[in-house]
Amino acid sequence: PKLRSKVGMVFQHFELFPHLDLTRNLTLAQEIVLGRDSATARAKAGALLERVGLSAHAHKHPGQLSGGQQQRVAIARALSMDPMAMLFDEPTSALDPEMVNEVLDVMVELAEEGMTMMVVTHEMGFARRVANRVVFMEDGAIIEDSPTDRFFRDAASPQAQRFLSKILPHLSLIHI
């Protein structure tokens, strides 16, 4: 299989099929792209919805869910394709603040299980907790690329230092 079929992608606006229920959102690509039979795809969808805490909503359509729930469905859909790695494009930026943690909790679990993830995020507490490298960008350019502990302890670039000086006082108030 091509590399792109082994990489899961989760966008900031979920990109779920609004006319399909959650189960079908998770089974469609499994059946078409991976060639899984319907029963196997449905079983995997059910297990993944359970994993992200949404099995009771399997029959619902995306519009009937909160933003945080929709994003967890998007993560489950990406996982349904058995990816080797996951890409996340600002997965919490479109969410109400109270929904952010339910998505980050799922992502922390993935990291703890060893899933390779590349995450574009402004959630520095999350990055500090799960990342092994931080790539700091400004205006589309890579400014700094360093191990997480070094980035947060002793950022090399003035831009990263300025950014961190604004957010680090707030991170100390958050349990990481």
Label every model-predicted segment.
Residues 92, 174-176:
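Conserved small/polar residues in nucleotide/adenosyl-binding loops
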